[in-house]
């Protein structure tokens, strides 16, 4: 695929995510039945955090595309480094995690993660925009251009830190309101919740390594860019 086509792809997907980040929080804003959905903002839902993350990543990717054409590759090392770090450690693992976990729980017992009553407010296309298309968009990014992966220690540490921060957010929300962000947690014992969180990190770490394998399979070994020291 040509560089122009890749730039166009980034621009189109960026605008798609900008639209979703604006449109979805507006759904049923004045509906009493969706009061719990809107209380606490988007930061309590991993799905909505992921949509915001994808918008940020594709925004950085677009900026990288434009600057490379305007001022040249050598002058924007930091932007390229940040783009790759964001995609490899967060954007790809998180979008794949949301896709796999949501649909696994949905087909097992949808009431654990997406109660049927939400269908009255969220059309099917919105559900798929939040939980399905995120994966092929990220997968396409892995095959459109190579990404320099950081060391496993750095990559998995950043991923782990973000996992831990979100767990704290979930627990803090529960302490404040007495309600779990996702119904699945209400069906688990304290030990079950600990095991769920542990399994979630193991899965997300595995997806990080999976993304690295895809990158190596498609592009071969890549040289990690070194940041210049002052």
UniProtKB/Swiss-Prot annotation:
Cytoplasmic domain ranges by topology: 1-7, 67-85, 142-155, 212-230
InterPro entries named in the record: ADTRP_AIG1
Catalytic activity line of the entry: 9-hexadecanoyloxy-octadecanoate + H2O = 9-hydroxy-octadecanoate + hexadecanoate + H(+); 12-hexadecanoyloxy-octadecanoate + H2O = 12-hydroxyoctadecanoate + hexadecanoate + H(+); 9-(9Z-hexadecenoyloxy)-octadecanoate + H2O = (9Z)-hexadecenoate + 9-hydroxy-octadecanoate + H(+); 12-(9Z-hexadecenoyloxy)-octadecanoate + H2O = 12-hydroxyoctadecanoate + (9Z)-hexadecenoate + H(+)
Main location: membrane
Gene Ontology BP annotations: cell migration involved in sprouting angiogenesis; cellular response to oxidised low-density lipoprotein particle stimulus; cellular response to steroid hormone stimulus; long-chain fatty acid catabolic process; negative regulation of blood coagulation; negative regulation of extracellular matrix constituent secretion; negative regulation of leukocyte cell-cell adhesion; negative regulation of leukocyte migration
Residue intervals annotated with topology Extracellular: 29-45, 107-120, 174-190
A cellular component annotation (GO) from this entry: caveola
Location of the protein in the cell: Cell membrane
Keyword terms of this UniProt record: Cell membrane, Hydrolase, Lipid metabolism, Membrane, Transmembrane, Transmembrane helix
Transmembrane regions listed in the UniProt entry: 8-28, 46-66, 86-106, 121-141, 156-173, 191-211
Pfam families linked to this entry: Far-17a_AIG1
Membrane association type: Multi-pass membrane protein
Family membership: Belongs to the AIG1 family.
Protein name: Androgen-dependent TFPI-regulating protein
Organism: Rattus norvegicus (Rat)
């Amino acid at each position: 695929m040509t560089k122009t086509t890749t730039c166009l792809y980034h621009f189109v997907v960026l605008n798609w995510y900008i639209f979703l980040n604006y449109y979805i929080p507006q759904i049923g804003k004045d509906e009493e039945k969706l009061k719990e959905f809107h209380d606490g903002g988007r930061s309590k839902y991993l799905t909505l955090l992921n949509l915001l993350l994808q918008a940020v990543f594709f925004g950085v990717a677009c900026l990288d595309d434009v600057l490379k054409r305007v001022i040249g590759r050598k002058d924007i090392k930091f932007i390229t480094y940040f783009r790759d770090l964001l995609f490899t450690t967060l954007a790809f693992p998180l979008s794949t995690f949301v896709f796999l976990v949501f649909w696994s729980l949905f087909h097992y017992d949808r009431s654990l993660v997406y109660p049927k009553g939400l269908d009255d407010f969220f059309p099917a296309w919105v559900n798929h925009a939040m939980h399905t298309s995120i994966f092929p968009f990220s997968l396409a990014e892995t095959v459109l251009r190579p990404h320099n992966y950081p060391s496993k220690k750095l990559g998995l540490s950043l991923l782990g830190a973000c996992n831990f921060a979100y767990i704290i957010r979930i627990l803090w929300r529960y302490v404040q309101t007495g309600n779990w962000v996702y119904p699945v947690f209400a069906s688990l014992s304290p030990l079950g919740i600990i095991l769920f969180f542990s399994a979630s990190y193991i899965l997300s770490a595995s997806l990080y390594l999976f993304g690295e394998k895809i990158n190596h399979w498609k592009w071969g070994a890549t040289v990690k860019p070194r940041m210049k020291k002052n």
